[in-house]
Amino acid sequence: MDGESPFLIALMGMDNLRVLYFHQHFSTPQGAAGIRSYQMARNLVRNGHQVTMVCGSYGGGNTGLDTPFLTGKRTGQVDGIDIIELDLAYSNADGFVKRSLTFLKFAVKSIGIALRHNYDVVFATTTPLTAGIPGIFARWLRRKPFVFEVRDLWPELPKAMEVIKNPVVLGAMSSLEWLSYRSAHRCIGLSPGIVDGIASRGVPRERIQLVPNGCDVDIFRQVGNPWRPEGINDDQFMAVFTGTHGQANGLDAVVAAAEVLQNRGREDIKIALVGDGKLKPQIQEMARAKGLDNIVFHAPVPKQKLVDLMASADIGLQLLANVPAFYYGTSPNNFFDYISAGLPVLNNYPGWLAGLIQQHYCGYAVAPGDAEAFADTLEHAADNKRELKVKGQRAREL
């Protein structure tokens, strides 16, 4: 995997480390979820280390285990990774209370594993923020080295989105965030804003590493059978979004742009929304109410089928709601999938990714909330295939 932390590289240089890795939403490439932790674990195994992955049962994910759960868990080895999968189902469509309870149950069960298991170093990755709890116990009760990877700043992001408003809950989360950072021997941030956010809590810069999301580019070279969702013809321009259909993703921007395109008579441009999430029914109803036939919805697909889909696409959509905390405080999986597939990217919010796209000439960046500009850019891309090809090549190089 590209862009590994010097601290992790140092770990890889040591012999026969036993790594206890906590990621509640872990998935192999057979699932329809991000595989950063899978790639990290595989790299550690390839370098001679033993990795035990502790995870839950994430909707859309696939741990590679299919045996029945016994006493609340099932275990096995997948691609050299020892896996402990806890019987804790989770879906992005679950309500706030149910998701919170699942997070807490995972943390409690993980503490027990951290206190009993034999290992040399513990690695925990968010989200959720509660993933850091077993690392805290490992650090202070067993004096184990603890590496904490931060994928999103909590509680800053849910507070900015007004998903969580209760001051007591926000205060508790802020305390947990501080304790997790201060307990870790090293913190990893996935974006410049996340690194700055960690440092703002008093963590010395020398203990923080920037390791942006990446992708195993070899996966995207293994194209099998390119395909398109039903309703999109081979001669049509296809823009694709892959990922969660939730509040953070701001997919209402797609509906607004699609309406502009349909009013302009651009029947040659289609938008595929691939994934699931709590707001998917709402987005589907918005499109239906406006009579839009240029948006096609599709269920989540495993990584290999995603590779084949992207091989048939013309441009990838990197979309988020217009929340300033997102501008520098996120590192989305789908952006790195797009560029690994050689897809130019259309991004609809300012920040470090917009700057990266413009700097490397690998796509387009439009202002948030501007449906006309969004539609204009899709039209421009559809009408300038030679330029689009160059941007796709630059994306793969990046």
Can you say where each PLM-predicted feature lies in the sequence?
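Nucleotide-activated donor-binding/catalytic signature segment of Leloir-type glycosyltransferases, i.e.
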Residues: V274, P281-D308, I315
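A short, well-ordered alpha-helix in the C-terminal region of glycosyltransferases
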Residues: A373, H380, E387-L398
